[in-house]
Amino acid sequence: HKAIRRQRQMCIRDRVNIGAFTGKTIIDPLRNVIGEQAYIYINYFSGAMTIIALLAVILLYKSTHTAGEGKSLREISRGFMKIITNWRLLILILIVTGFWMVQQQLYATMPKYVIRMAGETAKPGWIANVNPFVVVCFVSFITRLMAKRSAITSMNVGMFLIPFSALLMACGNLLGNDIISGMSNITLMMVAGIIVQALAECFISPRYLEYFSLQAPKGEEGMYLGFSHLHSFLSSIFGFGLAGILLTKYCPDPTLFETHAAWEAASVNAHYIWYYFAAIGLIAAIALLLFAKITESIDKKKEASR
């Protein structure tokens, strides 16, 4: 039942984002103690938590629903081929990759951008925590609000919020005097953009997983949902790669310059980075709108021919 599927996806998002929030509380205190080495040691912490979680699942989790479990590698390979030869699912994965490329900038661009532009006292860990906090607070409400709308419609709303979020992030470097005393405009507008980005995630993620699960043959829902996260693989590769190129071009490392004035001249257009991601988000949003129109037209023709 669709309502049950939505409830499951909301529960998944809540747990993922609670973990995302608590995990990020470590990085800023660690950075205050050991400096840049924190970005190395945080990976050890993440690895340890992952191993503990894996052992907990192996030892404690027992499913009462065994349909679709225990598949061989050959069956998994066949399932993968079914998905990549299903043009609807493949195109949807590629489109949603555009959203996640922008979302990945919480980790790829934002930390270095904020520290370089707002100063060493900036707290990128807490800034990034705005995302999971907003998702946990609003995902249930938004999913219920859009319950009578199709999954694609809900996703479209979120997709068109994404370019707006990137433009808000760019505004931090365009404003004059600080709007809020004690908080740089870079930080303020980054938080504003992340709030909008998190709301977009509330519209997109649960309904994306719902759409994927509805396309799966009975007993293969788990495998299809697993492959639905191919967007994470693609968005990480392309999102982090592009972030490195854009940071080098528009917001380079200050230690590479002899004077602060030379660095300021090199980073005067640092906000251009967010224009690129606004464009990616807008292209993805338009692509999803076209996808919805085309698939709806095809489905109507099939219904009429029956």
PLM regions: where:
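C-terminal ends and interior cores of transmembrane alpha-helices
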Residues: 160-182
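Hydrophobic core of transmembrane alpha-helices in multi-pass small-molecule transporters
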Residues: 180-204
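Juxtamembrane intracellular "pre-TM" segments in multi-pass secondary transporters
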Residues: 65-92
